[in-house]
Design a protein with these regions (language model features):
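Conserved residues at the C-terminal ends of beta-strands
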Residues: 48, 79, 130, 198, ...
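Flexible, active-site-proximal loop/turn residues at the rims of small-molecule/cofactor binding pockets
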Residues: 51, 82, 133, 201, ...
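Conserved alpha-helical substructure of the radical SAM core
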Residues: 2-118, 122-123, 315, 325, ...
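Generic structural signal for helix capping and beta-alpha/helix-loop junctions
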Residues: 52, 113, 136, 175, ...
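Accessory C-terminal segments flanking Radical SAM cores
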Residues: 232-332
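Radical SAM enzyme [4Fe-4S]-AdoMet core and its adjacent flexible, acidic
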Residues: 59, 125, 130-132, 140-256, ...
Length: 332
């Protein structure tokens, strides 16, 4: 299975409860950013620049857990910054496991090997390592030599210890797709559990020269989709069709709400117009109708999984052929 049975069961149960209750807008994945400090300055990441004035702020553990409880999403993505720099990261993960949340611990992998002792393998924890190319390319994007080798060493140690590990690859304008194919087969050969791939987001604070426009995304993902059946790709087939320009999907910005030291980030993980103090305020005060392709120019080229995979989850039960395609894909 592409995803563990326990995760499929949790999501199905959660979706059923939301639909029975009549809720139209509800979160699927909480993006929890306990800090924005990082040990790298990656070329495609706008987080450090966006939160430069508060880069040293760290979220107290009890505040992080309150956000998890207030949101109620069945999945929590612990990100940043580099979450392995967060001092109580072991306690945070343990508390999330105790709450039976499915966790994606997102890391650049530099500190992974030495941090494994803080965690224990279990069905709720997935370690998600960013890898944007083979060694030379990935080190260049990361701004430091040796990053790729450290990440791979950490991945191998984590898999040997029994942890579930997946990777996340951002695709840029200059990405060499044959190199990405080589990377994905390399990851499969070291027994990775899954691979995510998505076009990098065009942050306002970064140079737009490195990012894909919509047409370029279609071309790049035609190739990635063509190799996906041979690999443990976790991007859903409906999302891949969207990336190829073969399927229309509307963004679901509330599907992956973000909480950090400034509060609840509105409207989405990628765009910041304001921060709200409470989750309820985020959901009720954000004018969701203002955002999306053709509505806000910042959304023009965005095809990120954080906005569109939640749409797939919301839509899949409405069409039998989509539902069956997802079932077959998940079991292959």
């Amino acid at each position: 299975m592409r995803f563990p049975f326990s995760l499929n069961l949790s999501l199905s149960s959660y979706l059923f409860k939301q639909r029975v209750s009549g809720k139209e807008k509800f979160p699927l994945v909480l993006m929890l950013e306990p800090l924005h400090a990082c040990n790298l300055e990656c070329a495609g990441c706008g987080r450090i620049k966006e939160y430069e004035s508060t880069i040293n702020d760290t979220m107290p553990l009890e505040i992080a857990l309150k956000a998890v409880d207030d949101c109620g999403a069945p999945v929590v993505s612990v990100t940043g910054g580099e979450p392995l720099l967060y001092q109580p990261i072991g306690e945070l993960i343990e508390e999330l496991v105790r709450r039976k949340k499915h966790i994606y611990l997102c890391t650049n992998g530099v500190l992974l090997e030495r941090s494994l002792k803080k965690f224990r393998p279990n069905k709720f924890l997935h370690i998600n390592v960013s890898l944007d190319g083979m060694a030379e390319t990935h080190d260049k994007i990361s701004g430091e030599k040796g990053v790729f080798d450290k990440a791979i060493s950490g991945i191998k140690k984590a898999r040997a210890a029994g942890f579930r590990v997946c990777t996340n690859t951002s695709i840029y304008k200059e990405t060499d797709l044959k190199e990405i194919e080589t990377l994905f087969h390399f990851l499969k050969n070291i027994n990775i559990n899954g691979i995510l791939a998505a076009p990098a987001f065009e942050y306002d604070v970064l140079s737009k020269k490195i990012f894909l426009d919509r047409q370029a995304t279609h071309r790049q993902f035609e190739f990635i989709s063509s190799i996906s059946k041979k690999l443990p790709i976790m991007s859903t087939p409906l999302y891949l069709k969207f990336l190829k320009g073969k399927r229309h999907l509307e963004c679901t910005p509330w599907g992956n709400p973000t909480y950090n030291s400034q509060g609840w980030k509105s409207p989405c993980y990628l765009i910041t117009d304001t921060h709200y103090k409470t989750f309820k305020e985020l959901m009720t005060k954000t004018d969701w109708a203002k955002y999306g392709t053709g509505k806000d120019p910042r959304c023009a080229n965005c095809m990120m999984h954080s906005g569109f995979e939640p749409t797939v989850v919301r839509e899949v039960g409405k069409n039998f052929s989509d539902f069956w395609e997802m079932i077959v894909w998940n079991f292959t």
